[in-house]
Swiss-Prot record:
Keywords: Flavoprotein, FMN. It holds the Pfam family Flavin_Reduct. The keyword Transferase does not apply. SUPFAM superfamilies: FMN-binding split barrel. This is Uncharacterized protein YddH. One of its GO terms (molecular function) is oxidoreductase activity, acting on the CH-NH group of donors, NAD or NADP as acceptor. InterPro entries: Flavin_Rdtase-like_dom, Flavoredoxin, Split_barrel_FMN-bd. It comes from Escherichia coli (strain K12).
Amino acid sequence: MSRFIPIELHHASRLLNHGPTVLITSFDEQSQRRNIMAAAWSMPVEFEPPRVAIVVDKSTWTRELIEHNGKFGIVIPGVAATNWTWAVGSVSGRDEDKFNCYGIPVVRGPVFGLPLVEEKCLAWMECRLLPATSAQEEYDTLFGEVVSAAADARVFVEGRWQFDDDKLNTLHHLGAGTFVTSGKRVTAG
């Protein structure tokens, strides 16, 4: 007898998506307004030059800012940022500055000056939005080229994650406000 049970299709993505939850930051130079949102779906898509994909619904203010200004930040929150991550992913920033609302301190990115977060977080990237593709319209997927990146030296060692301290670990959203952290490193061979 099989131990497998049917999964409702609206939960099927959760079977694959246990990668790190990220915070997407954006800034409108004209109005001087900034925004931050949580996103469960992001991934690298090219090594050279480094390029990434993020999924941001076209109805969001974040998407408007990114498409208007052509740039965005990706912040990788740590366990200590769980409450921030859930909060900024649960409300729109169209009518309020979520950085101020939740007391999230900001650092400025070195290339675009994007709002980024280091406190309670493990890494960040500044990205330039790549020209629109059909995936952008059909699937809400935006592609960006990474122009600057930094990571906490306690957890990113010699080009890879090293999660020896449970408090310095990435968050992985399982849905409905439930998160897990990364496991222990296992080496093949």
